[in-house]
Amino acid sequence: MDATLQKYIDKLNALNFKEMYEGDFFLTWDKSDDELEAVFPVADALRYMRENNISTKIFESGLGISLFRDNSTRTRFSFASACNLLGLEVQDLDEGKSQIAHGETVRETANMISFMADVIGIRDDMYIGKGHTYQKEVAEAVTQGHKDGVLEQKPTLVNLQCDIDHPTQCMADMLHIIHHFGGVENLKGKKIAMTWAYSPSYGKPLSVPQGVIGLMSRFGMDVVLAHPEGYEVMPEVEEVAKANAAKTGGSFTKTNSMAEAFKDADIVYPKSWAPFAAMEKRTNLYAEGDADGIKALEKELLAQNADHKDWCCTEELMKTTKDGKALYLHCLPADINDVSCKDGEVEASVFDRYRTPLYKEASYKPYIIAAMIFLAKVKDPQATLKALEERGIARWFQK
């Protein structure tokens, strides 16, 4: 067997992830340490095989269904790529063109679209208290449908971003970090600064910063959450980060100083997000149909944002990081000064210097999603990876 693939299989052999089989992937903190760590070697193995022209199709037919309730480029194409890598066709559910627009229930829709579906990926991140709840409702509906004999199989649900977490993004970020620092074992004690940064828009989801502090604190890292006063994230996610840090020997601290967060940081992740309290209020206003209230809130939040234009990832701040060479992360697209906006999250020179690593960071997401699906659909991942290599079907046939 190929030595590199054997290395990935050996990593899996040391982990207990049996509960992932026939499961879903909602929040990273729902998973055990071993379950999270299993995703990484599977993602690496799938990537390695594709790079070496080995087909990784475990399905001869089947659907991967995507539902995006917010705009998406990277995650939309990553989900489609992941499904295709494993042999699934992708069908995007357009709610506006379905019977959902005419009052069809979640239970009915979930079952009607899932007769031949093996996975459902959902992005629902815009309204606090809604996205994760909706994803769970869909998962419960198809589980019951399978139990009742309506569905031949239970589709796996993958969270492509909700109001609480963005696991496919944060796991891709983590795999990028693991490769950058040479292994999971080298992350303990590394300082990561998850910092708010200015954006001319006001309503960016909380799920990325929440996902980052909820995941990175699992690996013994020193996680710093920095933001201006009033830009707090969900308190329950902060509690998750605190508990993780206490368990792993790392730390979780908060500051209202971007400079303090950047000082001696090994990794920086400057990104805008909307205040938790404001997003809660926004959700309630939409529920009440209060158009005037929504406009007033938008005006208030834009003015609040404008008071913090100095929260920008600059060359000067980057010089204060560990040896002036911190790894710069972003989920993309970034608000780049004098490129995508006048004032934004990052100076153009900083972004340009890290452009290639940023694109590589994004490139892990299709494989992370594929690994999540693989672990949910394959009872013996190690044996299946070995069989795929032994089968030796070329992904791209050439004479």
Placement of each model-derived feature along the sequence:
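Glycine-rich phosphate/diphosphate-binding loop of Rossmann-like nucleotide-binding domains
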Residues: 69-81, 178-292
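Phosphate/diphosphate ligand-binding glycine-rich loop within oxidoreductases
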Residues: 57-178, 336
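Short, conserved loop/helix-junction motifs that constitute active-site signature segments
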Residues: 186-188, 217, 316-325, 352-353
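Positively charged, low-complexity intrinsically disordered leader regions
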Residues: 1-77, 81
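Adenosine-phosphate binding glycine-rich loop
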Residues: 321-399
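A short helix->loop->beta-strand "cap" motif at the edges of active sites that frequently abuts
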Residues: 148-155, 221, 320-329
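Rossmann-like adenosine-cofactor binding region
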Residues: 243-347
